[in-house]
Amino acid sequence: MTQEYDRDLLALLPSLEIIDGLIKYYFEYCNWIYRHVNQSSFTHQWERYKSGAKADRIVLATACATMAIATHYLPVQHHLLEGFQDTHEEIGFKFFDVSSTSLQRHQAESKAYSLDLVELLLIRAHFLTLSKTEGEEIWHVRGELITIGTAMGLHRDPGKWRMHRDVAERRRWAWWHILLLERSVLFGK
């Protein structure tokens, strides 16, 4: 990873081997109900990020959010966290803080909406729900997701736009998860 502009954030993360292990753990064990992040799209972008081909703060923020959730679900004394002195919860919050900083930097540079941004906000809401510490922040993310999803037309049938099938499916999943989040926050679950 050779992104000069985020060296300070990358310095807060473990080795690439641990990062990849946590991301792999997330996709294998942590998203069987809530598939907020499209695995094939993210994996492709993550490989480009690691190679230095594309420096993207949304990708870094998403990687850190997946690591935070994976840390939450890891069994005690799992080999991926052997080098850490902190609790699983503290490690997860450290990864989430890096995700937050990366997202803030992205938003300071660009206000453009994308499916990658929607997926990042969804996975961040998932972590906030698991951590049970930032109830007000979940309301904020929920409102932002409804606004972004509607602005992007995620609520409309993508079949009418003659999109590639994979893109249409990804858009449907994103909208479905926005609605699930909206309903769960609305009903206080």
Question: At which residue positions do the language-model features occur?
Answer:
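Fungal transcription factor middle regulatory core
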Residues: M1, H78-L80, T101-S102, G149-K189
